[in-house]
Amino acid sequence: MFKPCYLFAILFFLLPAVTFAQNDTWVAIQQKIDAKPFAGKNMRLTAAAKTESASTMAMLVVRVDNTDKKMGFFDNMEDRPIRQTAWKTYSIEGKINDNADTIHIGSICVGNGHFYFDDFLLEIETTPGNWSAVPLVNAGFETNTISKGLPEGWQYFMSNSEKFSFSFTTSQTYKGTYSLQVMGKDVEDMEGLNSYLSMQAFVKANYNKSEFQVPMRDGIRIYTIVYTPKDASSANKYPIMLNRTPYSIGPYGKDKFSSFIGPSETMIKEKYIFVHQDVRGRYMSEGVWTNMTPHIEKKKSKKDVDESSDTYDGIEWMLKNIPFHNGRVGQSGISYPGFYTTAGSINAHPALKAVSPQAPIADFFWDDFHHNGVFTQGYFWNFPIFGEPREKPTDQDWYQLFEKPTPDGYDFYRRAGTLKELGEKYYGKNFLWKEVTEHPNYDSFWQSRRIVKHLRNVKPAYLVVGGWFDAEDLYGALITYKEIEKNNPGAYNIITMGPFGHGDWAAETGHHKHHQLYWGDSLATFYQREIEGKFFRHFLKESGDRNTGLPDAYMFNTGKKEYEKFDQWPPTNVVRKKMYLGANESLQFEAPATIDYSSFVSDPSKPVPYTMDIEGSFGITPRNYMSEDQRFAASRPDVLVFETGELTEDITLGGEIKVNLSVSTTGSDADWVVKLIDVYPGNEPNSKYTPKGVTLAGYQHMVRSEIMRSRFRNSFENPEPMTPDKVTAIHFDLQDVLHTFKKGHRIMVQVQSSWFPAFDRNPQKYVPNIYKAEATDFIKATHKVFTNSFIEADVIK
């Protein structure tokens, strides 16, 4: 799920935009102070600072954490960053909450170059007009000792320790003998910072902001922020672009502006009337929130409301109350907002002309929290975001994420025990955890939330957007496009898939990488200008006659590293090929003459890790593994490796991939993880942007992967155990690809039975509900994969 800047700002103490949270462009330091003696009083942080150039950015930060683990006062100077090359004092003032526990003070540096800080001072207003200083450690950096890379008394909060260093300077002092000097070097992907800085000024200069409580048909009011171009008039009208989100549309207040008010810099500069709404039950909106609100097909009264009706009512209000619009509305959103975009397009308001569900959630049994019904344990940490009830409308986060006891997610989850034990310890009152654990199968609870089944007789034009390396909602993008195609002949429906992780097309990073692999320059900008911008411009500002000049499918080939155009997706100029998991762990294009098998022992106490990235295994959601080098897994005895010889010609796979396994187990349940891998030649050179310590020679690039639980082999609604030692057929989708395996490369398939902690462990002893499994239910089992197992894919002619 795509959580924008507001969550990242809280989690990382400092960040002004999602771009910085996702890239190695920033560093921060902090001190913690006991706030309890100062509860209810005013405070003021002052410090001197300067930057080497106006192309970099620094900020002071104050955050107050309350005793209830929720955040109180917070200011990171997002709206007034430090970009001065001369010394100047800056300050943050605010009130300490009555139930305050801890005050965090510090500074942030973003970008390359030198940053300077001195003379930190935290003061408390003891009586009206009288301020007293709170003791800080090394506030003026006169103790010129660097310990563990930091000045004495200060703690790290940083994105990349290799790209920032700290030292003391006597030549650039503000006060006393020394000042702190921070240096950013070789920081890549500065496009996001530069874009952020330029858009911040552009939005304030070119848009007016207004806020409203918009009534729905049942009386509930939805909080709405409107950004209108200043040059809008009766002679210069603009279309409306709507975004509905559960993640907060802040900053709230007519004088506080968001920097990225639209889908892209391109569209912001072209100008639209941008409308943002907190969805029902979230943040400043009234009502009660429901995850993946079930769609009501036949509404019988005003009390029958869903996301479709809320979108309809919102658009109706906009047309009547927002001046200078041209009568056309568009809607877009990434991840959860993508779900709301899909929902808004069903039984849509006639003015809704164009929509773009981007990495949309389609069905929680295949997106985000599950893959083929297997629980995505890597999501465990973010359950409070979606499962803690809100007491009343608020402009603050009301939930609290539990503190990570270690950055090593693999070790934490392995030692934490069963899902039952984890839930009892952390989420006893979390309603989403209760829903997930009480509905282990694809019952009516999940089926009612499958929004794509309602995509029939749709009217708006669609641009469906996804990323080939989207760990969260790859399924959602592909199935949304396919359901529209299948059930709506004649609808304008196009799709684009790029070399992106979840939502990464929304922010330009310059030299685009996913994890360790470089894919090209300015790819997000290309998408924003040539695909997304062109789509909305045509349907909202131009003729809307469907002659957009865009292909039905604009797909990035992850082997050739270039976009390709298709008249339809999946493509039809293909030959269906089978790749058999042959004897001696060979991968063959011919069926075996005799049936043999490969076997391995699966031990739930020693599961196969899904990544070698220790800290990445305990993130908000697992992401980088989608293109990760698989050599770490290939060497394990509980991972089977099937491989072709060196290819004598290019082979391009395009479209759906099917897995057909013939297996057995000594247990009564098992998981099956299948990974399709491009093995680079032994002489593959590194790119200019390959990270230090990484070699592409022999790199095992994971192209596509998926997990399947045996109990669901015949039905996701009615699971059943396996019969020990009985050969059993397991079929599932590996999802679509467009990838050229080049001459000299090898094609590899890995098969394993755990993928931890991205996904939960199978006990391998059948139990009706794995969420209720006891520790004694987890057993070792021997799995066999027979040589008549195969992967089926389309080879483009």
Segments from the language model and where they lie:
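Extracellular and organelle-lumenal recognition/adhesion modules and their flexible linkers in secreted
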Residues: F20-S195, F618-R623, S627-E628
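Accessory cap/linker subdomain of secreted extracellular hydrolases
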Residues: F257-F260, K269, N291-P294, K298-D304, ...
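Glycine/threonine-rich phosphate-binding loop and adjacent beta-strand/alpha-helix elements that clamp
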Residues: S55, T85-W87, M158, V187-E191, ...
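Alpha/beta-hydrolase fold nucleophile elbow
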Residues: P323-S335
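Short beta-strand/loop motif that positions the catalytic acidic residue
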Residues: V464-G466
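N-terminal cap/lid segment of alpha/beta-hydrolase-fold proteins
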Residues: Y196-N236, E643, L647-E649
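Cap/lid segment of the alpha/beta-hydrolase catalytic domain
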Residues: D231-K320, E508-W519, S668, P681, ...
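Bacterial Sec-dependent N-terminal signal peptides
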Residues: M1-Q22
